[in-house]
Swiss-Prot record:
This is Translation initiation factor 2 subunit beta. Gene3D superfamilies: 3.30.30.170. GO terms for molecular function: translation initiation factor activity. The gene is eif2b. Disulfide bonds: none annotated. It comes from Haloarcula marismortui (strain ATCC 43049 / DSM 3752 / JCM 8966 / VKM B-1809) (Halobacterium marismortui).
Length: 134
């Protein structure tokens, strides 16, 4: 049997994989308005999925959205001003690009660490280390 024939046969016998090709997905923000306050209901689950501290993500959101806010006793974020889910999601996506995904291999298997006062992103998958904008 020729190589090309064996390759064709193997490709025919390989089952198709259903589902998404990405293993890392950030939950869509669950947002609701309370007057002039935007409440981010699933903030805790988002931070858990990102593997980052709540305070760090909150600080980024405040800076990116140009507003003030706090984390309430239920773990929800309360931001001053009206922000829709699309704007919050865009801000979280920026956070992921800057502080979660490795700049070399693109995987989310990273940790934030401080070295000589600088905040670095260390990838556990490829070993790369890169400076963040913080």
């Amino acid at each position: 049997m020729e190589y090309d024939d064996m390759l064709d046969r193997a490709m025919e016998e390989t089952p198709e994989i259903d589902g998404t090709s990405e293993r890392f997905e950030v939950p869509d923000p669950d947002i609701r308005q309370e007057g002039n306050v935007t409440v981010y209901e699933n903030f805790q689950s988002t931070c858990s999925r990102l593997g980052r501290e709540d305070d760090h993500v909150m600080k980024f959101l405040q800076n990116d959205l140009g507003t003030s806010g706090h984390i309430d006793e239920s773990g929800r974020v309360r931001l001053t001003g009206e922000f829709d889910a699309t704007r919050i999601e865009a801000s979280i996506d920026e956070y992921v690009d800057e502080f979660v995904l490795c700049s070399e291999c693109g995987l989310p298997d990273t940790q934030l660490e401080r070295e000589q006062g600088a905040l670095l992103l260390r990838c556990e998958a490829c070993g790369a280390r890169s400076a963040t904008s913080e």
